[in-house]
Amino acid sequence: MSASSTARRIAATAVTAGAVISTVALPAAAADHGHHRQPQVAISAVQADSPGRDDNSNRSRNAEWVKITNTTRHSVNLKGWTLRNRDGQTYRFRNVWLAGRSSVKVHTGVGHDTRADLYQDRRHYVWDNHADKAVLRNDHNRTVDAKSWGRGGHHHNH
C-alpha cells in the first residue's frame, strides 16, 4: 500500500468520523435551543386569602402576601422591579438585595421592611381571594414570572 493511499484512507476515516459526530451532536444542540429556562427570581408562593375573617385589619392584610425567591447563588438587586395584580395595583421594590437562594414575602399591609419581609403599606387588600394574577417584572419592565389562581388560572397556594 502506498503512502498516498494510506493518507487518503486516514483522511476518509476522519471525514466519516466527523460526519458521525456532528450528526450525533446536532439533535442535542437542537433540543437545547427550544428549552425554556426557569426564572432566576420567581414567585414561589402566594397567600391571597388571609386566614380568618377578612376584617381589613393590618394583621389580616399582612397575612396576605406573595413570596419571591432567588433561585441562584448570587444576590439580585430588586430595585425598580414591580409586583402587580390583575387590576393594575403595583408595588415597586426599593433598593432591596435578595441574597442567593433566599426568599422575601411581600405583605399587603403596613410594617417595617426586613430581609425576610417587605410591606406595601396599603390600607386595603390587594389580592382577590377567588381569582387574580401576580406578575413580577424586572427593572426593564419584562415579565420575570407570573402566578394565577381561580377563574382562568390554575395556581392556588395557601
Language model segments and positions:
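A structural motif detector for short, solvent-exposed N-terminal "entry" segments of globular domains
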Residues: 2-78, 125-129, 145-158
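Hydrophobic beta-strand signal
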Residues: 67, 84, 105-107
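Acidic glycine-/aspartate-rich tracts in secreted/extracellular proteins
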Residues: 72-74, 109-112, 139-143
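Short acidic, flexible loop segments centered on an aromatic residue
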Residues: 73-89
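Intrinsically disordered, low-complexity Pro/Gly/Ser/Thr-rich segments with frequent PxxP/GP/PP motifs
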Residues: 88-121
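Local beta-strand/beta-hairpin segments that build beta-sheet-rich folds
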Residues: 90, 143-145
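Short, surface-exposed ligand- or partner-binding patches at beta-edge/loop junctions that are enriched
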Residues: 118-138
